[in-house]
Amino acid sequence: MNLSLNDVLELTGGKLIGETPEISISGVNTLSEACAGDISFLGNEKYFQDFLTTKASAVLVPPALPQYPEGPAYIEVENPSLAFNALVGHFMKAVTEFTPGIHPTAVVDPTARLNPEKVCIGPNAVIEAGVSIGDGTDIGPGCVIGKGVEIGEDCKFYARVVVRERCIIGNKVVIQPGAVIGGDGFGFLLNPETGRYDTIDQVGIVVLEDNVDIGANTTIDRARFGRTVIGEGSKIDNLVQIGHNCTIGKHTVICAQSGAAGSTTIGNYVTIAAQVGLGGHLSVGDKAVLAARTGVMSSLDGGQAYWGAPACPAKDAARQFAAIRKLPDALKEFMNLKKKAAEIEALIQQAMSGEQS
C-alpha cells in the first residue's frame, strides 16, 4: 500500500519541487499531526503556521508559495485538497475493501434479484421480496430493504439504513448509518365530524439519483403521490429532514439540521447551510446560497445569497443586523435628546411666563 513519490505524482497530476531523495509514503494526515511517512496538504492559508512546522514527509502545496521549509518533499498541484482526496482514497481501499457474499444471519427473500458473488449483504440485514440490488453494492449490518426496492450498482449502505418499499436508488449512492429513505410523509387531515386527525396515505416513493450522498440519521419522506426526488450528485448532511413530494436538483448541498417541508422545489447547485428551514410549496432557484439559520417562507430566485428569517438578500440582512446592533446606542442618544428637548421646552415656557408678567 505504500506509495513512492512517482506514485503520488501519478495519482495527483502534481509537479515535484526541487530535487528530493526517494521516500516512501505510508499514510495521510493533517499538517499538525503528520509524522515521518505521512503526506499532508496545505489547502487553506489559515494553516500556514502548521505548514511551517509540519513533520510530514511530503506536502501537497498550491502554486507559488512564498517559502518552502526544509524537510518535506513538496508537490505542487492546482487544488491541494482535491489531490489529497485522491491519496486518501488509495489508502482507504484497505479499510473499505469490498468483499462479496451474504452473511449467514442476513435474511434475503428468495424473490430478491442479486448476484451473491458480486454484492455484500452484512449481518442481520433484511432484504424483502422483489428487491433488486446491482453489482458492487454493499448493504451493511442491520439494514432493512423493503419490498420492491431497486438499488443500483456500487452503492454503500452503512449500518441500520432503512429503505422502505418501492423506492428507487441509483448507482454509487452512499447512505450513512441510521438514515431512513421512504418513511411516510407527515400527512394528516383534521376531520370536522370526529374532531380527530385522519392519516393521509402516502403511496408515492423516493428516488435517489446517481452519486447522491445521504448523512447519518437523515430522513427523506415518500411522496403522497408520485415521487420525492434527490437529484444526481446532491449531498445531504446528517440530521436533515426532507418532506414528502420535495424535489432537490442536481449537485445541491444541504447541511446538518436543515429541513424542507412538503412539496418544496430546490434547484441545481444550491447551497443550504446548517439549520435552515424551508416552508412548504415554495421554490428556490438554481445556485442560490442560504446562510445558516435562514428561514425561507416564500420562493427565492436563484443566483444570489440569502440570510435571515424571513429570508432576504444577504446584503440587506447584514445591514439590518448591523442596524439592530446599534439600537442600544441609538436609544441612549434618543433619551438624551428627549431630555434636552424637555429642558429647552422648560426654558421656553419660563421665558414666555416672564414676558407675560
Task: Describe the residue ranges of each PLM region.
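Terminal amphipathic alpha-helical/low-complexity segments used for targeting or macromolecular assembly
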Residues: 1-105, 172, 178-179, 184-199, ...
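Structural signal for interior beta-strand "rungs" in well-ordered beta-sheet cores
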Residues: 41, 101-313
